[in-house]
Amino acid sequence: GSLITAMRTGAVAALSIQYLRTSSAREYAFMGLGNTARATLLCLMAVLEGPLNIRLLSYKGQELEFMKRFKEYSRLNFSIFENVEDLITGADVVVSCVTVAHGQFASDTCFKSGVLVVPVHTRGFQNCDLFFDQIFADDVAHVEGFKYFNQFKQFDEFARILLKQNPGRTSDQERILAYNIG
């Protein structure tokens, strides 16, 4: 994809994070560390203040290139994780920009109370569809074909939060999934 597509997608993901994270979110996990993840972090820094703890999934040296790209930003603190379950466990926000997934990324128990998961390319989080408290997407048409769509506990389009027609997160205990497909 183009840089414009990556930036647009990153901006939408950052907006979802800004509106749906818990009030105390500090740990941001990233997997799939290409242009979309980089754009998401750039946009996130524009809308969030203070230091950010950024967890990166180790994969083919991409985590080192990612950290190198952001080395001049002193408010970013990086840590590297060797496997997905460790990356997700304890994270307040999980951003996935991976383009290929074979099965689920992590068991249900890895997703702590209050977590926000933003699977930009939708893959690998099907188990979350069944137990997360709220699920948002840019457009119902993007997700209505999902295997478990009819079993979502609570679903709405993200735009309704921006229009103040849906409060979004109503407690810091809710697990929320935000599908940003574009």
Residue map of PLM features:
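A glycine-rich, Thr/Ser-enriched phosphate-binding loop motif common to dinucleotide/cofactor-binding enzymes
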Residues: 1-17
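Glycine-rich adenosine-cofactor-binding loop
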Residues: 13, 21-44, 58-61
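Short helix-loop-beta connector
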Residues: 20-27, 49-50, 112
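A structural signal for isolated positions on well-ordered beta-strands in alpha/beta enzyme cores
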Residues: 29, 53-55, 79
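NAD(P)-binding Rossmann-fold cofactor-contacting core
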Residues: 47-71
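Rossmann-like adenosine-cofactor binding region
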Residues: 76-150
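Adenosine-phosphate binding glycine-rich loop
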Residues: 129-182
